[in-house]
Amino acid sequence: MALDPADQHLRHVEKDVLIPKIMREKAKERCSEQVQDFTKCCKNSGVLMVVKCRKENSALKECLTAYYNDPAFYEECKMEYLKEREEFRKTGIPTKKRLQKLPTSM
């Protein structure tokens, strides 16, 4: 029984794990300035980072949470996931392997 590539139904693991994973990755990219500020603060503060980096941590959480709670952002990530899944069902090749360059012999 082959799976329909155009099927839009999502399993629980896709809704609860795979799409949120894409959301986290995209949100980190979009909040890159806050991620860099927090990372820099942590590196410079050592053991005291919990106390010294509260401002940077709050800014990062605020940025990420804004994306996590945005229904349009969820839909964008869901459509990206469905597109990847459809391509996998057509070709049988995972996205990661498709994006890798093929070795060339010369």
UniProtKB/Swiss-Prot annotation:
One of its GO terms (cellular component) is mitochondrion. InterPro entries: Cyt_c_biogenesis_Cmc1-like. The keyword Transport does not apply. A motif (Cx9C motif 1) lies at residues 31-41. It is found in: Mitochondrion. It holds the Pfam family Cmc1. One of its GO terms (molecular function) is metal ion binding. Residues 28-71 form the CHCH domain. A motif (Cx9C motif 2) lies at residues 53-63. Keywords: Acetylation, Copper, Disulfide bond, Metal-binding, Mitochondrion. Component of the MITRAC (mitochondrial translation regulation assembly intermediate of cytochrome c oxidase complex) complex, that regulates cytochrome c oxidase assembly. PANTHER family: COX ASSEMBLY MITOCHONDRIAL PROTEIN, COX ASSEMBLY MITOCHONDRIAL PROTEIN HOMOLOG. Belongs to the CMC family. This is COX assembly mitochondrial protein homolog. It comes from Homo sapiens.
